[in-house]
């Protein structure tokens, strides 16, 4: 019984789309990362000449402009997206366009943006999984077939090619259409198993007045042979521009193309254009072009002024216009050999077009930008003569113009406006590029654009006036008038001078190829001896990327700050900082533009004395040192400090105590005392919490009343007269916030003061209503109801079902995100330290000043708070029991964040490319934290905190780190393709197996092939040149390398503890490398096993980390490629898969490897692992499934125990012991995870010869590694000291399996006990049926859980289970009641199946 949970989402971009989605005038970028849908907006920002972004309030009009991507919403989909297109409907909720998504297994989903919910809404979902269509003995399964989705440019219909030869056509209602299919439904259509959800905004109405219940008409499925009987092998299709009826072009062949049969099947591709009659469900062939090159693989429709279609092949580009005229150009010397098709010769370019991505540059010339698989960018220009294309010219983009921006192949592209283009990649970072023309070309382009717009308007008028005359024309609505002909002749005869620059990037760690666990290197800075609990025991390092983008990524489960200084001054309860101005000028909010001597920063540490007394100790910051500062007037009564801050433009230090508010000058001399008690009634009052925002202080007292103070120009505080509601209402929490975005303000008020910031007061009443007031006029802006119900949407309306409510302890509004674009968020803290994050948005724009338009949408948070252990609950008897409030950090290393102190110490982070998420701080309990200004401008702004061990640390965030996820990621560029990775324990370094591309030329000295000497070829093939590299983890630089032969490829790199002496039986940690020497399919492959030791040498004095070097200890040439390696047994031997044998070998003193045992295997062994210390191993074959074998040492023998008779194509595998049960996890090539069990006592296993299949689980990602890891105890599982907990056998260590994938995602499989499995299984069933899933997909069908029907149990989906945490309090309790469990039991189970079991990372 296991559960699969995704710890990190996929990062590689597979699809992208430019669309006005959030509104009719918006420019949005929709990005798909395998099964994650992200919606971005574009934001123009100012930047300096060095590229540093400048905050909006500090920007000047003369500064450079850049465009950034801002993530609006993100969705995890229960399906693998295969394509997506833009559809313009008659009516949508937002007024923008809709998105049509195609999924694996023939599904289509139509979604729109819902501004009332600030998210996507599913209009319909269409299934095309009919058995009579997809089931055929000679047709592959749907999961093995690709699909093609294309939408007509006028959005009249969409075509979906699935299952090789099936074509689904989905019509859409448009203004002026003459479809009469609304009520028509044939018998075949009734059986199409199409499910269409009527969740759209209402009925759609065309200009003719016909009312449609849905924005689409009934779809139908046709075989491609119904269009033409010759379409047997479709290649690509796309809808074309400038046709009156929906018209698409399709590439196909009558026979399968083959490079090996090129001399017989040369020029076998056809290109045919069909027009569709949606009313009659018929098609008409308009033109056909025959005998095209056989390597064509893609159709790209071109808009005006070029028009027609561009056909892309491996070696050439072919343009076909609307009349069937062709123009072609060859881009390498093989174009003449593979085809006799007439084409221009540009073979000197030597381009490889396989896997290229093409995008239109948004100007009037019709130029295209090609991104090649190597990352090189190429410009394609069409020579136009009227409406006719007279030629194609190609030019690589030079490096100085941005031609080397892309580091690897692009997988998707989207044109964003007139000067921006986006390229997504699965192998490198996705980039948003901006381009510009040279000054002369820019002036010419602007003049041409104006003339085109003018002529286009004239042409449109002509077309409208003569519409009836040309109604039977299949092409554009107007004939080729001289004006239009002149309009299309706009392309210059020469290339424009383009220059590209990077606006923004989306980080990517895909594909993850290999992982290793190593010990983290100690920081270089000398920070004292207080680092024991802020560094992880191990760090997870993965090899990522492809080709020149390869490198390492260091993954940390928790944030490990860079400690700049630390000290221990005894018991500390709280820490505050205050930066005070010594001169007359105020400190700038961004940048260090004034002399540092004009500012002084104090650090106040509070030491507990009794339960209601504490001592305040003041320090002054001098560099990284804290020097004691004598301030006798600072809290002389040892009262409890509630808050410390600055007012009066940072000229006054204010200390809010329990009984009074004290104001100090720059030398901390007392300036004013303001009592907290009620002066009118003389009732004694005490402050519980406070919020400061210059010039106001909001104080919440112990009787739940509010005290509002305001500082005048001189800095003196005075109480503000409050309205009746403010003064008489009982409050639970208060927060002051400067509204720079004006999202909380009425639009009329915001437009009048668009340049000013409004100060708002947020108050949470005792009945959990959120009041929003504008200061100083105390105007009530809005009242949000039912905050403690935690619904998905917070609004002025009370939730319908609100009987069950959460106990809230704090509510704040703070900025989150990059410091140049911070966005407000409402953060709620519950009584048990759960954090709930809401994002404000405007839901309606019907009436100015309407308070009902303000709403809050709930953000996803799957991080559970920790249960405090007994050692942390009683920290000190003298420590005050006041609440540790959330700490707002306006700027911490360029980010606006919020910190939660306590047992679950964590930051709430957000970047422009991510949603708000929780980042836990490494270490134990954090008692208090505050921001910290470094005197060195290069260090920026950090933070200072005190932990439960009374250690005060001054820290900053780790530089060059990605904070977009719940784990921190640090990328280390290697510059080569990294396939294999191992950690050398003895030297504490990482050994990498890398490769780079190198040209291959046939050897001229080969005696068997003397004709090779006469080969004259300049376009050489590329092979991989492999090398071993040693990387030091302190500096992450390569310190040594070992180059292999030109035809030798690294297949495995492992760190093993081998016996190095037969006499002394000494054992050492060695690096063992398995290689393959392949020189062609007609020559048997050989292999070699290398044994290296990373030895210590004298380092370079300037580079002390270069003290390690690879030393070759042994080398053994063997027959067959060495494809897998593993340590085995207890005597220091290794087992190697060499060819069709698995052989156990021992290292001799002369460096040779002596074989002692072997076992014959099947075809190609790519997985070989031992259950450490047992001799039991698994042998995974890429074609013949998994074997379970054993090795014995007396005598030396290999024995086969059992095997899987289903023969999956094994990609990765590993053991998963669970008590006395032994499971084997196998990942196949279809993204499935098989759970097998070795159970010889089961009669179904034939005495153990057959491995029992317990379940199958579809992960949706192509697996790269499976790694067995020990599991630590989660906080919910730690028994209390006084509880009567059951005894657990300490010898049984729980295990889990970490899974990495080619898409960049990381998941974990955890074994769970019977009781937890039953609870979570019932919870999963409830969630699958009750939760509204994005795009209308079915998570149960997506995971396709199967079992053997007896003792098998389906694997649980952790992603689905964690959605329970995102529900409202009422729904959570209802579902928990149906499951028959308490809320804390479900939370404990969810923590157990999450990443908390990786406590050592």
Curated annotation (Swiss-Prot):
Keyword Nucleus appears in the UniProt entry:
yes
What organism, scientifically named, is this protein from? Aspergillus clavatus (strain ATCC 1007 / CBS 513.65 / DSM 816 / NCTC 3887 / NRRL 1 / QM 1276 / 107)
* Acidic residues bias spans: 458-472
Q: Where is the signal peptide?
A: none
Annotated GO biological processes are: mRNA processing
Start and end residues of each stretch annotated as Disordered: 181-208, 444-472
This entry's Gene Ontology molecular function terms read: RNA binding
State the compartments where it is located: Nucleus
What pairs make up the disulfide bonds? none
Please give an example of a GO cellular component term from this record. nucleus
Compositionally biased intervals (Basic and acidic residues)? 187-198, 445-457
Task of the protein: RNA-binding component of the cleavage and polyadenylation factor (CPF) complex, which plays a key role in polyadenylation-dependent pre-mRNA 3'-end formation and cooperates with cleavage factors including the CFIA complex and NAB4/CFIB. Involved in poly(A) site recognition. May be involved in coupling transcription termination and mRNA 3'-end formation.
Query: One matching Pfam family, short form?
Result: CPSF_A
Q: Which family does it belong to?
A: Belongs to the CFT1 family.
Q: Which UniProt keywords apply?
A: mRNA processing, Nucleus, RNA-binding
Protein name (record): Protein cft1
């Amino acid at each position: 019984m296991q559960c699969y949970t995704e710890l990190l989402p996929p990062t590689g971009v597979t699809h992208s789309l430019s669309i006005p989605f959030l509104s009719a005038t918006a420019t949005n970028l929709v990005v798909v990362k395998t099964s994650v849908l992200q919606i971005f907006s574009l934001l123009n920002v100012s930047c300096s000449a060095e590229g540093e972004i400048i905050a909006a309030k500090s920007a000047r009009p003369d500064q450079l402009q850049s465009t950034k991507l801002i993530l609006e919403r993100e969705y995890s989909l229960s399906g693998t997206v295969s394509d997506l297109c833009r559809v313009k409907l008659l009516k949508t909720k937002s007024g923008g366009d809709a998105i049509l998504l195609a999924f694996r297994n023939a599904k289509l989903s139509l979604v729109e943006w819902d501004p009332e919910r600030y998210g996507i809404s599913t209009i319909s979902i269409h299934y095309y999984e009919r058995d009579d269509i997809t089931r055929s003995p000679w047709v592959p399964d749907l999961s093995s077939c690709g699909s093609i989705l294309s939408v007509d440019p006028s959005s009249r219909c969409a075509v979906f090619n699935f299952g090789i030869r099936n074509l689904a056509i989905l019509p859409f209602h448009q203004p002026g259409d003459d479809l009469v299919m609304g009520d028509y439904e044939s018998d075949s259509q009734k059986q199409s198993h199409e499910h269409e959800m009527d969740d759209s905004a209402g009925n759609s109405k065309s200009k003719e007045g016909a009312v449609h219940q849905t924005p689409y008409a009934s779809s139908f499925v046709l075989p491609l042979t119904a269009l033409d009987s010759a379409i047997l092998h479709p290649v690509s299709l796309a809808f074309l521009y400038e046709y009156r009826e929906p018209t698409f072009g399709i590439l196909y062949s009558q026979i399968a193309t083959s490079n090996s049969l090129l001399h017989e099947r040369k020029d076998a591709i056809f290109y045919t254009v069909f027009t569709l009659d949606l009313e009659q469900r018929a098609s008409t062939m308009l033109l056909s072009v025959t005998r095209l090159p056989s390597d064509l693989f893609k159709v790209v429709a071109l808009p005006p002024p070029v028009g027609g279609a561009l056909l892309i092949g491996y070696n050439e580009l072919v343009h076909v216009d609307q009349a069937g005229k062709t123009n072609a150009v060859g881009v390498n010397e093989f174009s003449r050999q593979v085809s006799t098709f007439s084409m221009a010769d540009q073979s000197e370019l030597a381009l490889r077009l396989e896997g290229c991505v093409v995008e239109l540059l948004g100007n009037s010339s019709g130029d295209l930008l090609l991104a090649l698989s190597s990352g090189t960018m190429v410009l394609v220009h069409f020579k136009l003569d009227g409406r006719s294309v007279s030629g194609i010219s190609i030019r690589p983009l030079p490096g100085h113009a941005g031609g080397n921006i892309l580091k690897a192949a692009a997988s998707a592209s989207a044109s964003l406006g007139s000067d921006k283009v986006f390229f997504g990649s699965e192998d490198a970072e996705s980039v948003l590029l901006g381009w510009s023309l040279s000054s002369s070309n820019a002036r010419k382009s602007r003049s041409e654009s104006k003339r085109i717009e003018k002529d286009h308007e004239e042409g449109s008028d002509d077309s409208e006036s003569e519409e009836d005359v040309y109604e039977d024309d299949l092409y554009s609505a107007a004939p080729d008038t001289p004006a239009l002909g002149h309009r299309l002749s706009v392309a210059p005869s020469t290339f424009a001078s383009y220059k590209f620059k990077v606006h923004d990037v989306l980080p990517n760690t895909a594909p993850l190829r290999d992982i290793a666990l190593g010990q983290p290197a100690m920081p270089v800075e000398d920070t004292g001896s207080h680092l024991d609990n802020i560094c992880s025991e191990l760090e997870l390092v993965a090899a990522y990327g492809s080709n020149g983008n390869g490198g390492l990524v260091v993954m940390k489960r928790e944030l490990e700050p860079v400690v700049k200084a630390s000290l221990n001054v005894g018991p500390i309860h709280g820490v505050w900082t205050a930066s005070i101005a010594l001169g007359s000028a105020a400190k700038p909010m961004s940048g260090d533009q004034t002399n540092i001597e004009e500012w002084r920063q104090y650090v106040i540490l509070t030491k507990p004395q009794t339960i209601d007394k504490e001592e305040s100790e003041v320090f002054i910051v001098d560099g990284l040192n804290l020097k004691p500062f004598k301030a006798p007037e600072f809290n002389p009564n040892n009262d409890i400090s509630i808050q410390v801050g600055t007012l009066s433009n940072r000229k006054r230090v204010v200390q809010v105590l329990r009984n009074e508010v004290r104001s100090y000058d720059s030398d901390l001399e007392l300036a004013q005392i303001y009592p907290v008690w009620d002066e009118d009634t003389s009732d004694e009052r005490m402050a519980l919490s406070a919020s400061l925002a210059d010039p106001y202080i909001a104080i919440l007292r112990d009787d739940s009343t509010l005290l509002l103070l305001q500082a005048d120009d001189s800095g003196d505080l005075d109480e503000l007269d409050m309205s009746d509601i403010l003064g008489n209402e009982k409050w639970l929490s208060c927060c002051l916030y400067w509204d720079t975005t004006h999202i909380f303000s009425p639009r009329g008020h915001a437009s009048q003061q668009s340049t000013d910031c409004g100060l708002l007061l947020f108050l949470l009443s005792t009945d959990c209503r959120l009041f929003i007031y504008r200061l100083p006029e105390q105007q009530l802006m809005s009242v949000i109801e039912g905050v403690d119900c935690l619904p998905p949407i917070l609004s002025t309306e009370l939730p319908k079902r609100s009987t069950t409510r959460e106990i809230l302890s704090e509510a704040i509004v703070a900025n989150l995100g990059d410091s140049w674009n911070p966005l407000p968020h409402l953060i709620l803290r519950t009584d048990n330290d759960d954090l709930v994050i809401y994002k404000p948005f405007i839901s309606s724009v019907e009436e100015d000043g309407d308070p009902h338009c303000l709403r809050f949408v709930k953000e996803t948070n799957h991080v559970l708070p920790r249960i405090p252990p007994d050692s942390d609950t009683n920290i000190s008897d003298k420590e005050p029991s006041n609440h540790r409030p959330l700490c707002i950090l306006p700027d911490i290393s360029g980010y606006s964040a919020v910190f939660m102190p306590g047992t679950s110490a964590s930051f709430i982070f957000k970047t422009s490319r991510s949603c708000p998420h929780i980042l836990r701080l490494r270490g134990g309990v954090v008692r208090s934290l505050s921001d910290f200004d470094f005197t060195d401008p290069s260090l920026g702004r950090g933070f200072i905190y005190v932990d439960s061990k009374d250690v005060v640390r001054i820290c900053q965030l780790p530089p060059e780190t990605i904070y977009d996820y719940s784990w921190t990621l640090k990328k280390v560029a290697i510059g080569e393709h990294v396939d294999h990775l191992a950690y050398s324990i003895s030297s504490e370094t990482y050994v990498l197996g890398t490769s780079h591309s190198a040209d291959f030329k046939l050897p001229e000295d080969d005696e068997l092939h003397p004709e090779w000497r006469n080969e004259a070829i300049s376009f050489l093939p590329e092979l991989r040149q492999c090398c071993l590299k040693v990387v030091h983890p302190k500096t992450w630089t390569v310190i040594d390398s070992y180059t292999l032969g030109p035809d030798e490829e690294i297949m495995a790199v492992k760190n093993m503890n081998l016996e190095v002496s037969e006499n002394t039986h000494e054992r050492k940690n060695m690096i063992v490398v398995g290689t393959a020497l392949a020189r062609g399919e007609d020559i048997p492959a050989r292999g070699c096993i290398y044994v290296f030791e990373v030895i210590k040498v004298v380092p370079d004095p300037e580079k002390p980390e270069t003290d390690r070097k690879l030393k070759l200890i042994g080398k053994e040439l063997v027959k067959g490629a060495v494809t897998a390696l593993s340590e085995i047994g207890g005597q220091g031997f290794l087992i190697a898969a060499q060819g069709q044998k698995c052989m156990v070998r021992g290292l001799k003193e002369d460096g040779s490897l002596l074989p002692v045992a072997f076992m014959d295997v099947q075809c190609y062994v790519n997985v070989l692992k031992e259950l450490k210390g047992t001799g039991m191993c698994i042998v995974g074959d890429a074609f013949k499934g998994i074997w379970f074998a054993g090795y014995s040492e007396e005598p030396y023998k290999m024995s086969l125990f059992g095997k899987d008779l289903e023969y999956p194509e094994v990609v990765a595998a590993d053991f998963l012991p669970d008590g006395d049960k032994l499971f084997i996890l196998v990942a196949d090539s279809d993204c499935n995870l098989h759970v097998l069990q070795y159970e010889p006592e089961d009669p179904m296993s034939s005495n153990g010869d057959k491995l029992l299949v317990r379940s199958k689980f579809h992960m949706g990602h192509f697996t790269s590694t499976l790694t067995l890891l020990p599991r630590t105890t989660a906080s919910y599982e730690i028994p209390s000291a006084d509880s009567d907990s059951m005894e657990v056998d300490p010898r049984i260590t729980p295990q889990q399996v970490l899974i990495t994938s080619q898409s960049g995602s990381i998941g974990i499989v955890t074994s769970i006990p019977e009781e937890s499995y039953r609870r979570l299984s019932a919870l999963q069933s409830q969630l699958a049926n009750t939760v509204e899933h994005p795009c209308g997909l079915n998570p149960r069908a997506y995971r396709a859980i199967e079992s053997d029907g007896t003792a098998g149990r389906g694997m649980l989906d952790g992603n689905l289970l964690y959605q329970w945490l995102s529900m409202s309090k009422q729904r959570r309790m209802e579902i928990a009641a149906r499951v028959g469990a308490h809320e804390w039991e479900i939370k404990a189970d969810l923590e157990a199946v999450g990443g908390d079991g990786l406590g050592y990372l």
